[in-house]
Curated annotation (Swiss-Prot):
Ranges in the topological domain labelled Cytoplasmic: 1-6
Protein name per UniProt: Glycosyltransferase 8 domain-containing protein 2
Family membership noted in the UniProt record: Belongs to the glycosyltransferase 8 family.
Enzyme class: transferase
Species classification: Eukaryota, Metazoa, Chordata, Craniata, Vertebrata
Main location: membrane
A molecular-function term among this protein's GO annotations: UDP-glycosyltransferase activity
Membrane side Lumenal: residue ranges: 25-349
Length: 350
């Protein structure tokens, strides 16, 4: 009898330890991405009517996110819910900027991203160190940000929206596709820009085809690439296909084998997405992602073409709040001054 009692005590102890381990794991995972407004309750009808837009607000370029938000909000009558993502030390500044500016009327939630989720998954060698910043990888973790919504828009912070965001949200995703992107070969005018500044628009520019792991993928190096700075995503498919886990796997492989090409600095976050989504994504209307405005300060699009564009993206080194840059007047018209006076434009006439 005493032996049986002792066995029961041991089993009870093991059960308690197991439950504590499970509880710790859940709590720890929940702190990687924390939503300040998780206590907000919304009816199913309200959630159906909302268009969730995820955008990151990094400390050194927070004015970019605010300009993007301003352009989206000002060009639509749709019910937008902005998920503004930042690191812990920037959250209060994000809130102050929104609540003490013309953006105070927007519907928003502030979300904390904890970089611990990226530990051991990023190689420190990049020609553009700014692309190694933690927030550059937020797009990999969308399901941990969005819990109630079936469909979500992700935008890089260096964009301006000139059209009604409802049109982008209405992008049709084919059955079995977790996301839609804009191909790098989809616009004649984009092709002209590619030639002028010597840009790559194929997988060759992002993956190192000298490596066996890349060759074994069976993807032609001449396959047209896409830019993940604008994403329309289906959260159900994303979770079903375990997209986040797949992306993390290819991040880890790159740490171990250095699989990404050094010819393009943007390959840090783009390359794993090109692998995971190869042949399995829908396409966005090309006018909803006019890009490469930040690649060369001497290369410009025509004014007529820019007026037709629904979304402008200054991907590249030359940002519209800095000098030199091109078409910065289009960006500056949406700039929201920093109430704290920290973020300033670096233009000769500013």
């Amino acid at each position: 009898m005493a032996l049986l009692r002792k066995i029961n005590q041991v089993l009870l102890f093991l059960l308690i330890v197991t439950l504590c381990g499970i509880l710790y794991k859940k709590v720890h995972k929940g702190t990687m991405l924390r939503n300040e407004a998780d206590d907000d309750s919304e009816t199913p009808e309200e959630m159906e009517d909302e268009i969730p837009v995820v955008i990151c607000a990094a400390a050194g370029r927070m004015g970019a996110a605010m300009a993007a938000i301003n352009s989206i909000y000002s060009n639509t009558d749709a019910n937008i819910l902005f998920y503004v993502v930042g690191l812990r030390n920037t959250l209060s500044r994000i809130r102050k900027w929104i609540e003490h500016s013309k953006l105070r009327e927007i519907n928003f939630k502030i979300v904390e991203f904890n970089p611990v989720v990226l530990k051991g998954k990023i190689r420190p060698d990049s020609s553009r160190p700014e692309l190694l910043q933690p927030l550059n990888f937020v797009r990999f973790y969308l399901p941990l940000l969005i819990h109630q919504h079936e469909k979500v828009i992700y935008l890089d912070d260096d964009v301006i929206v000139q059209g009604d965001i409802q049109e982008l949200y209405d992008t049709t995703l084919a059955l079995g596709h977790a996301a839609a992107f804009s191909d790098d070969c989809d616009l004649p005018s984009s092709q002209d820009i590619h030639r002028l500044v010597g840009l790559q628009n194929t997988y060759m520019g992002y993956l190192d085809y000298r490596k066996k792991t890349i060759k074994d993928l069976g993807i032609s190096p001449s396959t047209c690439s896409f830019n993940p700075g604008v994403i329309v995503a289906n959260m159900t498919e994303w979770k079903h296909q375990r997209i986040t886990k797949q992306l993390e796997k290819w991040m880890q492989k790159n740490v171990e084998e250095n699989l990404y090409s050094s010819s393009l600095g943007g390959g840090v976050a783009t390359s794993p997405m090109l692998i995971v989504f190869h042949g399995k994504y829908s396409t966005i209307n090309p006018l909803w992602h006019i890009r490469h405005l930040g690649w060369n300060p001497d290369t410009r699009y025509s004014e007529h073409f820019l007026q037709e564009a629904k979304l402008l993206h200054w991907n590249g080194r030359h940002k519209p709040w800095d000098f030199p840059s091109v078409h910065n007047d289009l960006w500056e018209s949406w700039f929201v001054p920093d109430p704290a006076g920290i973020f300033k434009l670096h233009h000769p006439n500013s």
